[in-house]
Structure formats: C-alpha cells, structure tokens
C-alpha cells in the first residue's frame, strides 16, 4: 500500500521588509504631524443644509486657522421649516405662516450621537424627553457635551406680519424675503474640539401643547480649502548666521610713503576698526524690538503688560500675547522665545530669566525621578543589559525548578 505523500514544510510568507515599511510609515506620519503648523491659515466654509428639502440655509466662509475658525452662523427658522411643513398648515409660504412660526418654542436633538431611546430620523432623534440638548423653550434645554447651541435671534415677537419687503415694501416691519424668525448657531467648547471630517446631523421639533410636534432635520458641514499653493520656505536670512562671530581682523597700519626725517617720531594715522556684524540672537531681538516699536506707536494700550513671541515653525508668524485670564501662552510656547515688554521698552533680560527657570525645572524634574529611571535615560544600554540578565536568570530558574521536579518524580 502506498504511503502518504510527505508533506512539505510551509513556506514562510512573512515579508522581511514588513517591520521596516511599517516603521517608515509611522515616521512619515509623525513628521507630517509635526510640520502641520496650528497657525496655518485656510479657507473654511461652514454649511447648514435642510435635509428635508436639500436647500442650503447658511453658507459662511472665512479665513482662519483650524482652531479658531468657528464663527456664529445666522439663518432663519423658515429655512429649516420650508413652505409646507405638515398637514396642520404649519409652513412659511405666507406672511401669516411665518408669523405663526414665531409663536412656537423649539428644541433640538443630536443625530451624530444618539442616546438610547431617542429614536432615529423619523423622530428627529427626539424619541423621548431628555434627548434635547439645545433650543428655545420654556424649560431651557441644554447640554454639556453637544457640539452646538441653537437659539432665536433678537427679532421682537411684536414685529408684526412677516411681509416680504421686495413685494410689500410699504408695510411696516417687512423684511427681505419675509424672514422674521432669525436663529443663531454657536459652537460649544466640545464643538471646537470635535472632528468635523464628516457632516453631523440634528433634528429640530416645534413644541405644541397638543398633537405631535413636527420634525425637521438639518446637517452641519465644514469644508477646508487651501488658500493657494504653498511656496517652499527657505532659511530665514535673519537666522543664517548661527555660528559665533569670528575675531576681528588685525588691521595693519599703512606704510608711510616717505621715510620720516631723522629724529622725528613716526606718525601712524588712526584707522577705525571694521564694524562687527550682529549675530543671529541680536537680529531676532531686533525683530521683536521692531514689533514693540510698531505696537507702541499704533496701540499703546495693548503693551501695558504683554509678551512678544516668535513662533519657530512655518509660516513664521510673529504673535502678540496680552496678559490676561484667557490662556497660559508662555507655557504653550514653552517659554523659550518670549520677551516681556511694557511702556518702558523691551526687557532684554527676559530670555536669561526664562532659561534660568527652565534649568531649575529640569533639575527639579531629574531630582524627582528614581535612580533606575535616571540611569536608563542617561545610558540606554543599561536598560537592555538589565533586561537581558533578568531574562537569562528567569530562564535558568525555570530550568532548575523543572530539573528538581523531574528528579523527585
């Protein structure tokens, strides 16, 4: 009988370059993140869309950074209701319908994060009470985690019929398009920190004392466009001189054209030494000093107590930080490129004081660490050696235990 065929060993299909490829991708991603400056200005467009009709309620574009481009968005409630909303006659087709919409409270429920029991699009994500996170109602709905707040604008309720000024220009209180239900959308702190890579949806319902509250849905989208091709930024000519200045060249006195008469003292004309070129530190300090002079002439009230800072990364903006309770800017910039200024001028000792504080912090940090952590940071091979020795000892101990168990068994 023919025996079974001998099985061939499986070929290792592991790519030997796999770890290196993954490491390269991670390094490239890390470099791209570091080069992405938070001060980069882009063209940011926010768009509010009525998902029931597909019409745009608001489209606001502005130039700003990704951390600051969060404007207030203004639109009208009728942009979300439409001309005919439900079978009861609610809608914004007529001036009377627009005026009637002003008498209702409304509440908003998030569709990007739907809590349990809040339903789906049909219920406007407001399937039960407690799902609402914002709105304009007598119970003042609010939330600490939602991304936006939506409130009514400043139009008084006694404005009168909402006539279109292009049709009824002689009617008191007429507005362009008959818009008399202004809404104001603002971003919360959570909204400023959230990711807006995809549209986010909310449901809005009018509150009625009887019957079912009508539903509409809207989305909020952010579109980011580059303001133009990025020109490669070379080295700053101000900071090219990074090496210490060389010693001044010894100037030799000019040789007299004719020898002096016997017994007369030789007269050597005095020559002025060549002017020394300012170093990189002096040039950077002159930039900050120039910014201070410009501020002192244009807005002297802004420099009563302020920090002038140079940002080290592109696009090389020069920032003016005014002291206040807004944010600890010196900690954010690691206190390495800030100079204190007031009406007396730029304090040139600020950098030395900051370096001293940084040195003290570093010493305090090193003193608070244990001896093992400090040794491992100073000598990376020490950690590798300890790990190898400990691993060998553990293996020997296991083998010894196994040998003793075998002998006694």
Swiss-Prot record:
Glycans are attached at residues 43, 58, 296, 328. The lineage of its organism: Viruses, Riboviria, Pararnavirae, Artverviricota, Revtraviricetes. SUPFAM superfamilies: ENV polyprotein, receptor-binding domain. One of its GO terms (cellular component) is virion membrane. Residues 33-384 are virion surface. This is Glycoprotein 55. Gene3D superfamilies: 1.10.287.210, ENV polyprotein, receptor-binding domain (3.90.310.10). Residues 1-32 form the signal peptide. Compared to other gammaretroviruses which possess 2 envelope proteins (gp70 and p15E), gp55 corresponds to a gp70-p15E fusion protein with a deletion of a portion of p15E. It is encoded by the defective env gene of the virus. The Friend murine leukemia virus complex induces a rapid and fatal erythroleukemia in adult mice. It is the replication-defective spleen focus-forming virus (SFFV) contained in this complex that causes foci of proliferating erythroid cells in spleens of infected mice. The second component is a replication competent Friend murine leukemia virus (F-MuLV) that serves as a helper virus for SFFV. It is found in: Host endoplasmic reticulum membrane; Host cell membrane; Virion membrane. GO terms for biological process: fusion of virus membrane with host plasma membrane; symbiont entry into host cell; virion attachment to host cell. The chain crosses the membrane at residues 385-405. Homooligomer. Forms heterooligomers with mouse EPOR, probably via their respective transmembrane domains. Forms covalent heterodimers with mouse MST1R isoform sf-Stk, probably via disulfide bonds. It comes from Friend spleen focus-forming virus (strain Lilly-Steeves). The keyword Signal applies. Disulfide bonds: none annotated. Keywords: Disulfide bond, Fusion of virus membrane with host cell membrane, Fusion of virus membrane with host membrane, Glycoprotein, Host cell membrane, Host endoplasmic reticulum, Host membrane, Host-virus interaction, Membrane, Oncogene, Signal, Transmembrane, Transmembrane helix, Viral attachment to host cell, Viral envelope protein, Viral penetration into host cytoplasm, Virion, Virus entry into host cell.
């Amino acid at each position: 009988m023919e025996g079974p065929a001998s099985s061939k060993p499986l070929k290792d299909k592991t790519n030997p370059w796999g770890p290196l490829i993954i490491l390269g991708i991670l390094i490239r991603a890390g470099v791209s993140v570091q080069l992405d400056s938070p001060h980069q200005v882009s063209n940011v467009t926010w768009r509010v869309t009525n998902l029931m009709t597909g019409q745009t309620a608001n489209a606001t574009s502005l130039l700003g950074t990704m951390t600051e481009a969060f404007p207030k968005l203004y639109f009208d409630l009728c942009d979300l209701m439409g001309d005919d909303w439900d079978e009861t006659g609610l809608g914004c087709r007529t001036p009377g319908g627009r005026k009637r919409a002003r008498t209702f409270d409304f509440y908003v429920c998030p569709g990007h994060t739907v809590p349990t029991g809040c339903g789906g699009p049909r219920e406007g994500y407001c399937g039960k009470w407690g799902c609402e996170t914002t709105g304009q109602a007598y119970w003042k709905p609010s939330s600490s985690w939602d991304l936006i707040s939506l409130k009514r604008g400043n139009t008084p309720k006694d404005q009168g019929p909402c006539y279109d000024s292009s049709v009824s220009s002689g009617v008191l209180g007429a507005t362009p398009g008959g818009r008399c239900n202004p809404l104001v959308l603002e971003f919360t702190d959570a909204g400023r920190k959230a990711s807006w890579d995809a549209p986010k949806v909310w449901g809005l319902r009018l509150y009625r004392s009887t019957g079912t509250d009508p539903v509409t849905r809207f989305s909020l989208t952010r579109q980011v466009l580059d303001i133009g091709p990025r020109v490669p930024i070379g080295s700053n000519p101000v900071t090219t001189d990074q090496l210490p200045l060389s010693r001044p060249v010894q100037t030799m006195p000019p040789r007299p054209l004719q020898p002096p008469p016997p017994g007369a003292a030789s007269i050597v004309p005095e020559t002025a030494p060549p002017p020394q070129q300012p170093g990189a530190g002096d040039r950077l300090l002159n930039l900050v000093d120039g910014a201070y002079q410009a501020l002192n002439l244009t807005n002297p009230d802004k420099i009563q107590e302020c920090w002038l800072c140079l940002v080290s990364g592109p696009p090389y903006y020069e920032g003016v930080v005014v002291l206040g309770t807004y944010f600890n800017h010196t900690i954010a910039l690691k206190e390495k490129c800030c100079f204190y200024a007031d009406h007396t001028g730029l304090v040139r000792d600020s950098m030395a004081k900051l370096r001293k504080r940084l040195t003290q912090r570093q010493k305090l940090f090193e003193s608070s660490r244990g001896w093992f952590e400090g040794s491992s940071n100073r000598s990376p091979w020490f950690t590798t050696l300890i790990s190898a020795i400990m691993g060998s000892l553990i293996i020997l101990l296991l083998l010894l235990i196994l040998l003793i168990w075998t002998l006694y068994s």
